[in-house]
């Protein structure tokens, strides 16, 4: 089992807080993530999380898909001194914001500010804020 029912419920509460639409959540290992990243983004390397929004052509469609690399999540959690489940939650928040149209590479800090608000709201470790400021 990748996450307990309680932790799945926690991710569901994050998703519901941000959007009434469904979200597909997929867990993969580093090899699978590298394959997805190469196929979808033409980058032949692994990464921690990817998001794939669906076009807003039909309101009944899910918001999109979030793909999380469990291998990197475990490594990063250990490196930063928090739990694997907390790392998954941080990555999920990051991906959800991308699904909602935020883009930290092209905005003026709006996505990072929203991440900070959500991390505080859900009482998660501030490591995502610290490491993204270093990027």
Swiss-Prot record:
Zn(2+) binds at residues 94, 98, 104. One of its GO terms (cellular component) is cytoplasm. Gene3D superfamilies: Metalloproteases ('zincins'), catalytic domain. Its main location: cytoplasm. PROSITE patterns: UPF0054. Its cofactor is Zn(2+). Belongs to the endoribonuclease YbeY family. Single strand-specific metallo-endoribonuclease involved in late-stage 70S ribosome quality control and in maturation of the 3' terminus of the 16S rRNA. This is Endoribonuclease YbeY. It comes from Campylobacter jejuni subsp. jejuni serotype O:2 (strain ATCC 700819 / NCTC 11168).
């Amino acid at each position: 089992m990748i996450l307990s029912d309680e932790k799945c419920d926690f991710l569901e509460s994050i998703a519901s807080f941000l959007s009434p639409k469904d979200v597909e959540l997929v867990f993969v290992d580093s090899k699978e993530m590298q394959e997805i990243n190469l196929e979808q983004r033409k980058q032949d390397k692994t990464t921690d999380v990817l998001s794939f929004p669906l076009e807003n052509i039909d309101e009944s469609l899910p918001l999109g898909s979030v793909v999380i690399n469990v291998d990197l999540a475990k490594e990063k959690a250990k490196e930063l001194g928090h739990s694997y489940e907390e790392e998954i939650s941080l990555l999920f928040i990051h991906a959800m914001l991308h699904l909602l149209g935020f883009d930290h590479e092209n905005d003026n800090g709006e996505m990072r500010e929203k991440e900070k608000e959500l991390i505080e709201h859900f009482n998660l470790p501030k490591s995502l804020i610290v490491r993204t400021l270093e990027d």
